[in-house]
Structures are given as C-alpha cells and as structure tokens.
C-alpha cells in the first residue's frame, strides 16, 4: 500500500486532501465532520476584522458542474471565531485560518488572532475576485503583496500561505513578491458572469463572481506547473478537483497537497474517501510508493 502522507511547509498531512476555504468551514462542527469524512486538514472561511453580511441573494449560480459565486466575504468577524477554531481543533488534524484585509496591519492583526486561537497556519486571501477593496485588488499589487507577506512573516510564528489569483497579468511576478510565504495556494476562482437572457440582466446580485469547479481545473494545473517550475516552493493546488485523476494532475504539476471545495456541493463529503481509495490503487498500479514520488514529475 502506498504512503499517502505528505507535508506542506513542515505541516504533516495524513493524505494530500484538504477542505478549501469557502464551504462547510464557518462552523467548528461542520469542519470536524469534513475531517471525520477523510479530509486531512481544513481551511476556514475567510475571516475579516469585522462581521460582514456579504451580498444579498442570489449569490451562487450553477454553471454545468461548476459554480459562479459572489457571496461577498460574509463572515462573523475575527473576535467571534475563536470557538469555531477550538471545536475544529478537536480533530487533532491541522486547521488553517483564512484571513482577508485591505492592508498589512489588518492582515497581521488577523494572523495573530488565528495563531492565538490555535491555527496551524494562516492562509492569506489575496485573490477574492468580487469584493472591492479586498482580495484581488490587494493581490494584484506586487508591492502591497510583498509588504503584507513580509509583515506577516515577521509577526507570527506559524507558517504563512499566500493564496494567489489567476486574474492577474503575470502570476510569477506576484508569486515572487510573496516569496517569503511558506507556501503558495493556487488558484482562487476565475472572475466570471452569467446572464439571464429572459430577464436581460446578470443572474448574481453583484453581477459578476468567481468561477470554481471543473471548468477552471486546466487553468489551476497550468499555474501550479508554472509557479513550481519557477520557484520550487511548496504549493497547494486548488480548482476543480472532483476525482483522483484531478488530484494526481495537480500533484504531478508540482502540488504537495490539494484543496477541494466545489465538489462538496456537487458530490458531497464522500469525495474525500473516494479520492483517497482510488488514488491509493492508482499509486500501487503505477509503482508510486509515496505522494512525494509524484510531486512535480510532469515538469519539463
């Protein structure tokens, strides 16, 4: 039997599958449930300094087997999130705190809180594509990205992950600006829109949102490949992973672990155990003894 354990920035995972930020991760008990169903770690919902209601419905629209969402970074605020982290930590598995802000000082304050609450790492949401003043507007500015990452690394002791956007002209430039991060998370959603041709208007209240799911997988695989080849840094791949083949593609492109989100909506929590079982069979058949044996093997 193959060894499915892996590590990212020194954090050991029993398998390479993590829950991505944005689904079943605002509540400690749902995070526990996901880990009990096979996820090796969870990433929390992106949390800001203050409570935020987000956009009014509709905030999600189906696009084939993918989704377009514009939830609007709704969250309870960092001071109201401590108990959810503590509950999730009962699993004994890594819990990564996702945070968003518009400036380095606020990011650092959020990171300190997540560390204080017991998070094993902090993921910087530098890439949400549908909220003004946050996410993509921050993550497309190399100087600001560098300032945020460097400040965070100097102020907290747990690993820092930088979640980067595909909606930029040069992702390598942004990755290099975030080079002091302990790992990259690639990719966030792709800016997208769906029109209701009868109503003659966008379906989402916010007009545009972020496309996730199988539709973006080739984009995610490409960026993991490019950034791994250029930087050699640990990478967590995310975007469209539904099957073991999807996960293996990301790993062969250079990811040490992957995150799963939309498949929780389209397939359900069984996606974790299904992928683990089928990946194990694949690795035995292909004579891969460990996840590390597969990481980056496709890079030329």
From Swiss-Prot:
Name the enzyme group at the top EC level.
oxidoreductase
UniProt cross-references to InterPro entries, sorted A to Z: Aldolase_TIM, DHOD_1B, Dihydroorotate_DH_1, Dihydroorotate_DH_1_2, Dihydroorotate_DH_cat, Dihydroorotate_DH_CS, Dihydroorotate_DH_I
Pathway involvement?
Answer: Pyrimidine metabolism; UMP biosynthesis via de novo pathway; orotate from (S)-dihydroorotate (NAD(+) route): step 1/1
Q: GO terms for molecular function, please?
A: dihydroorotate dehydrogenase (NAD+) activity; NADP binding; uracil binding
Q: Which reaction does it catalyse?
A: (S)-dihydroorotate + NAD(+) = orotate + NADH + H(+)
Q: Which cofactor does it need?
A: FMN
Q: Which GO terms describe its biological process?
A: 'de novo' pyrimidine nucleobase biosynthetic process; 'de novo' UMP biosynthetic process; thymine catabolic process; uracil catabolic process
The role this protein plays is:
Catalyzes the conversion of dihydroorotate to orotate with NAD(+) as electron acceptor.
Q: Which family does it belong to?
A: Belongs to the dihydroorotate dehydrogenase family. Type 1 subfamily.
Q: What is its quaternary makeup?
A: Heterotetramer of 2 PyrK and 2 PyrD type B subunits.
Protein name per UniProt: Dihydroorotate dehydrogenase B (NAD(+)), catalytic subunit
Which gene specifies this protein's sequence? pyrD
């Amino acid at each position: 039997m193959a060894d499915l354990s892996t590590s990212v920035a020194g954090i050991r995972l029993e398998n390479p599958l993590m829950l991505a930020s944005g689904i079943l991760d605002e509540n400690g008990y749902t995070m526990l449930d996901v880990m009990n169903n096979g996820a090796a770690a969870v990433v929390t919902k992106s949390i800001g300094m203050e409570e935020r209601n987000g956009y009014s419905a509709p905030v999600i629209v189906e696009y084939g087997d993918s989704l377009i969402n514009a939830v609007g970074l709704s969250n309870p605020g960092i001071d109201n999130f401590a108990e959810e982290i503590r509950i999730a930590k009962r699993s004994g598995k890594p819990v990564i705190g996702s945070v968003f802000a518009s400036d380095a000082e606020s990011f650092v304050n959020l990171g300190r809180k997540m560390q204080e609450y017991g998070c094993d790492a902090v993921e910087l949401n530098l890439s949400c594509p549908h909220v003004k003043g946050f996410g993509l507007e921050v993550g497309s500015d190399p100087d600001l990205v560098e300032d945020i990452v460097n400040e965070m690394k100097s102020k907290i002791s747990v690993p820092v992950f930088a979640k980067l956007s595909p909606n930029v002209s040069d992702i390598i430039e942004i990755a290099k600006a975030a080079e002091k991060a302990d790992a990259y998370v690639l990719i966030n959603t792709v800016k997208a829109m769906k029109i209701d041709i009868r109503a003659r208007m966008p379906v989402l209240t916010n007009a545009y949102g972020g496309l996730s799911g199988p539709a973006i997988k080739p984009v995610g695989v490409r960026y993991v490949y490019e950034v791994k080849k250029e930087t050699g840094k640990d990478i967590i791949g995310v975007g469209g992973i539904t099957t073991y083949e999807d996960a293996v593609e990301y790993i062969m492109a250079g990811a040490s672990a992957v995150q799963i989100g939309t498949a929780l909506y389209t397939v359900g929590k069984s996606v974790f155990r299904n992928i683990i079982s089928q990946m194990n069979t694949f690795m035995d058949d292909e004579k891969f003894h460990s996840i590390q044996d597969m990481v980056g093997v496709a890079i030329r």
